[in-house]
Amino acid sequence: AQDYVPGIYARIVNSAGNTNFTEAYGQVKYQLSPSLLVNLGLRAHHFGLRKEIMLENRAGLLWTLNNQHSLSFGYGKHSQPEDLNVYMIEVGGVAVNKDLKISEAHHFVLGYDWQLTDKLRFKAEGYFQYLWNIAGEEGTSYSLINLRRALYLNKKLVNNTEGRNYGIDLTLERFLADNYYYLITGSVFTSKYKAGHNVWCNTRYNKGFVLNALFGKEFYFANNRKVLDVNARVTITGGERYSPILESQSLAAKRVIFDESRAFSEQLRPLTYADLTVNYRINHRKSSSVFSFQMKNVLGAPIYIDHNYNYQTGQIELSKATLVIPNISYKIEF
């Protein structure tokens, strides 16, 4: 990996290792009454590196009020190991993270389902998640809860991070009928964490909201032998969070230095993504020909990567990429 000065390379990570991960899951379903359904589950897994068996209980309750309305409640205990290279890295020739515990979380969900018509449904879900034993660095705001890439991780970590996520999801869904369908979803949420700095603050992914709209329409020709279907999706999402940059220190050091005392207090602007898919099907006697055209990111929305120091301009810049991806395909179905 390249160090901060052009032409100078430094070894950041050089480690190797292996382990195993085994899991099993069981579920039972009880119909307590015609309107009350209970699901109970248990997941067990063994992480070879820690030689530890963990049990996770799950429960779900569905209460059907009538043909149109139902309520649901769900709980689950979840846990997962980090990427393997997190445990295998060496600092000063010592594998400093092999004793890290597995991250754990409690998930609670409360839902409401309203069948408005035989073609239209509304759903609302509220949720709360509490996370603990997440790995982070002692005395700083650094935590794997905000990690995007573990490739260059070379820090000694401890299980010092807590997190909490809560929000509400709303869905309006029209099933495919009369040759068209649509799906509209909206989410409002908050995501916070507390690491070694012992302060609750935003996670990187506390975007605040996400809106999605999906629409599809079918057109029939030639006695239904030919079908043209058009599908479009639009997503509007709040921007990712980032920590303020200490500009004078960064320019002097020729690398980005963040203000860890105000971790992830800044936010990038909201983004709008759009995808378009057009399929044209010709039904033959014993087969079908399908021509497809797909365009991802039609509006050319940028993908923000990270802040970096530009050696040519001597400035701190936000790196980004814009990918508009077309795809054309043809297939024959028998």
Q: What are these regions, as identified by a protein language model?
A:
Residues S35-V38, Q68-L71, K119-F122, D178-Y182, ...:
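Repeated loop/turn-to-beta-strand initiation elements of outer-membrane beta-barrel proteins
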Residues V13-W132, T185, V210:
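Structural signature of Gram-negative outer-membrane beta-barrels, strongest in the C-terminal barrel
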Residues N18-T22, I53-L55, E104-F108, F128, ...:
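Residues that define the transmembrane beta-barrel architecture of outer-membrane proteins
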Residues D3-Y4, G48-R50, Q68-F108, F128-K155, ...:
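Surface-exposed extracellular loop regions of Gram-negative outer-membrane beta-barrel proteins
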Residues Y182, T235-R255, R269-D275, Y280-F334:
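C-terminal beta-signal and adjacent terminal beta-strands/loops
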Residues Q31, V38, F128-Y130, Y152-E240:
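Gram-negative outer-membrane beta-barrel transporters
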Residues I12-F21, K101, R121-Y181, E317-S319, ...:
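Outer membrane beta-barrel strand-and-loop segments of large Gram-negative receptors
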Residues A24-Y30, A59-W63, L110-W114, I168-R174, ...:
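Residues on the lipid-exposed face of transmembrane beta-strands in outer-membrane beta-barrel proteins
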